[in-house]
Amino acid sequence: MASIQNLYETVVGVLGDQASKVISALGEITVECLPEHYISVMTALRDHEELHFELLVDLCGVDYSTYKNEVWQGKRFAVVSQLLSVKNNQRIRVRVWVSDDDFPVVESVVPVYNSADWYEREAFDLYGIMFNNHPDLRRILTDYGFVGHPFRKDFPISGYVEMRYDEEQKRVIYQPVTIEPREITPRIVREENYGGQ
């Protein structure tokens, strides 16, 4: 635990006002920052001689709109990165809150960490978070014609469109979802002596 406390103090000293919040909980350090400080925070964590977080091992988008099963009062979207220092055998989490809920945009960290390339594409594809100055920001998991972003909390379970093969046109076509809602009533079977009576 002493190393976590030392890491916490070093991070607070190095980042200063660039970090909105530095949290030490459950044996992990989380740095929260605003979008305008994102690149400088990531660069400082990588380049500072005492920190040396040279690897970005994960980056993902998060939709907090129904966090803890209630209406979320803060910003809706965040980009969360996990960094690793091989030299110091330490990990740190960086969370940047995206300022606009309707059109989420944050700066790309690909110039700082090359490994962020496909992670940022995945966050764009699944959450609709745009990354400024990304070298190749396009969908990576869904179809190019896919409508919406499926990991957003307001995305319908059935989606917006479905695709099927049309025999007449001899090709795959897209059409609006044709799911018919139905009511399912459970069948109740009563047995004699059920419940020991």
Swiss-Prot record:
Annotated PANTHER family: NADH DEHYDROGENASE [UBIQUINONE] IRON-SULFUR PROTEIN 3, MITOCHONDRIAL, NADH DEHYDROGENASE UBIQUINONE IRON-SULFUR PROTEIN 3
Organism (species): Neisseria meningitidis serogroup C (strain 053442)
NCBIfam families: NuoC_fam, PRK06074.1-1
Membrane topology value: Peripheral membrane protein
Keyword match Membrane: yes
Family of this protein: Belongs to the complex I 30 kDa subunit family.
Known EC number: 7.1.1.-
Protein name per UniProt: NADH-quinone oxidoreductase subunit C
Catalytic activity: a quinone + NADH + 5 H(+)(in) = a quinol + NAD(+) + 4 H(+)(out)
